[in-house]
Regions:
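Phosphate/nucleotide-binding beta-alpha loop and adjacent structural elements of enzyme active sites
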Residues: 1-258
Length: 258
């Protein structure tokens, strides 16, 4: 029986597997940015464990990175974050009254609303300095020439990471981007400029395909049994107008894919 680790229902990794890579024989390379400990709510462990994929896990918080290396010894694990530049960055680690420093909600900068909520829950903040890489420095240092899947969940820093990926010769075929903090519209526009088409949404994540690989995924889709289309992002995450536009773009893409 296959084991999935991702957040939500259906789990993120199961959703990605069934929609984009449903053949267990498909080989690939993934990048998970914001990997945490490599196990808790992990979106890519399934692909390494079950399908034998090569993986790169990026986690900038030192004490969490230590657990990542223990949980995922077969991956390439990096104690860095991605950004629009290479260097260092101030980072707000969250100390939870129950879970302590082991939380998934640290961020370069929390939104005022989220910070107010966390304080109300009894959380405190510990400022640390993390190392960050621009995308091109990351792929050149790791000698990466192909990426099939990237999962990007960095608590509101997504736009900066994407800005650092512009004009790169190596871009992921499939992008899974958490949109709840930065906003769907902003991220959709950046990715469109980078050569991506919006596909579908599931829970807090939006999925994008690189335009040049659309025929490949159309072929894979045609070979699989038809299933229900995933629900769009909930209303509380984006505006009704954005949601209507998102659904329209999804429908247009499905028409193009046949």
């Amino acid at each position: 029986m296959m084991k999935f680790y991702g957040q939500f229902d259906p789990p993120v990794d199961r959703f990605i597997f069934e929609r984009y890579f449903p053949d267990l024989g498909t080989q690939g390379v993934f990048v998970e940015c914001g990997a945490f400990d490599g196990q808790t709510e992990c979106s890519c462990r399934f692909f390494e464990e079950t399908m034998g994929w090569k993986g790169y896990n990026l986690e900038p918080v030192p004490w969490i990175y230590e657990r990542l290396t223990q949980n995922r010894p077969m991956s390439s694990n990096l104690n860095v974050g991605l950004s629009d530049r290479t260097g260092t960055q101030r980072f707000q680690s969250v100390v939870h009254p129950v879970y302590g420093r082991d939380t998934t909600i640290g961020a370069v900068e929390h939104s005022p609303a989220l910070k107010e909520y966390l304080i109300a829950q009894g959380c405190t903040f510990e400022e640390i300095t993390i190392n960050v890489l621009a995308w091109n420095d990351f792929i050149h240092r790791q000698k990466i020439s192909r990426i099939d899947l990237m999962v990007l969940d960095v608590e509101g820093h997504e736009a900066s990471v994407l800005d650092g990926m512009r004009d790169s010769d190596v871009l992921p075929s499939v992008m899974c981007v958490e949109v709840g903090h930065s906003g769907f519209g902003i991220l959709r526009d950046i990715l469109a400029e980078m050569g991506y088409e919006y596909d579908v949404s599931s829970n807090a994540n939006a999925f994008f395909l690189r335009r040049d690989v659309l025929p490949l995924f159309a072929f894979r889709s045609a070979a699989q049994p038809k299933t229900a289309v995933a629900l769009p992002i909930p209303d509380e995450i984006i505006s009704r107008a954005d949601l209507d536009e998102l659904i329209s773009e999804r429908d247009q893409l499905l028409i193009r894919l046949g």
